[in-house]
Amino acid sequence: MPLKPGSRVLVGSSGAAQGGSPLSGGYAGAKRTQIFMVNYSQKESDRLGLDLRFTALAPRMIPDTDLGKHAVAGYSRYLGISEADFVKSMASPPTSSDVATAVLEVVTSSDHSKGKAFVVSGKGLEAVT
């Protein structure tokens, strides 16, 4: 079924879409593709006057989740440093709460001018350029 005018589509991407990933390059590429698809979809919606909003959220690594803990362990091993040192080296990693707040902010905002894809860090949302 077609989406109703005013509908929003939120795609869960990853911060790996921005910087790549030496441990999982295919994953990073797939997540970047999601951002391309959101941009293409928004352009088509605008062109056809469908009044749909497509947004991608790309959280950076979230150390307080099970997946994040595995990622921290893998990257720290790869780099030959402790997990604590790896986490300290991360620039403003988001928490689960930061990501939840970002989701709410994006789906409740009526301001379409801020962008279509956002990285989520501990500092909040940053538009992907």
Give residue ranges: language-model regions.
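Generic alpha-helical hydrophobic packing signal
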Residues: 13, 54-56, 106
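Catalytic loop of short-chain dehydrogenase/reductase
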Residues: 6-49, 58-65, 69, 73
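C-terminal helical subdomain
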Residues: 76-129
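Rossmann-like NAD(H)/NADP(H) cofactor-binding core
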Residues: 50-57, 116
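Conserved short-loop catalytic and cofactor-binding motifs
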Residues: 25, 56, 87, 91
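A generic alpha-to-beta junction signature in SAM-dependent methyltransferases
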Residues: 2-3
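A general secondary-structure boundary signal
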Residues: 8, 53-55, 110
